[in-house]
Amino acid sequence: MARSLYSKFVLGYLIFGLLSVLTIATFSSGITRDYLIKDRANALYDEANDIAASCSLMYQGQHQDMDLFSTQLKNVSTYLRTEIWVVNKSGVVIMDSKNGARIHTIIPDFDPTATGNRSYTIGTYYKLFDQNVLSVSAPVTGNYTTYGYVLIHLPVSEIADSQSHILDILYMTCAIIFALSLV
């Protein structure tokens, strides 16, 4: 009888451990991914607005050193691990953060309102990327006119890497709690 009770206890304990890992793998993974996407999108949107405000200075009659601006664009891009484009209203890239690799690229059927009520989109951005990217845009305005847009693209793989690191922490915490519950 005692042996049967002990085996049931061990079986219940193992089932509890398995259910804990499955819960982390399903619920926590999705919640973490959604949180990271929204968090990165908000941070990139704020950065895009800052860059757009800097671009807007030249439309307000202030001089802008384009070489300095280009260098700053590259530095921000490197720091954020993103690709940054400045495009005109027609969707032609006029400046980028990758040493001009995308300059004069035409974004087919460019529609800055395509994001709807969200501040970001996820996809290959008009099939211009080989992998999915998180893209945000901010208008470049001056004198109540929109002259173009600042677009920032973050590879979704960067978000997946962060998600993986966070889930590793959750799995380790689960294992520690599981081991400590034996005491």
Feature map (PLM): residue ranges:
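Selective recognition of signaling/oligomerization transmembrane alpha-helices
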Residues: L167-V183
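Helix-start (N-cap) segments at beta->loop->alpha junctions
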Residues: Y59, T141-N143, L151-Y171
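Extracytoplasmic/periplasmic sensor domains and loops in membrane signaling proteins
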Residues: S70, V92-Q131
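Amphipathic alpha-helical bundle/coiled-coil segments
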Residues: I84, L134-S137, H153
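Extracytoplasmic/secreted envelope proteins and their assembly/folding machinery
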Residues: S70-L73, S137, V156
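A short beta-strand signature within small-molecule sensing/ligand-binding domains used
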Residues: T121, F129-T141, G148
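Juxtamembrane segments flanking the first transmembrane helix
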Residues: A2-V93, K98-A101, D161, D168
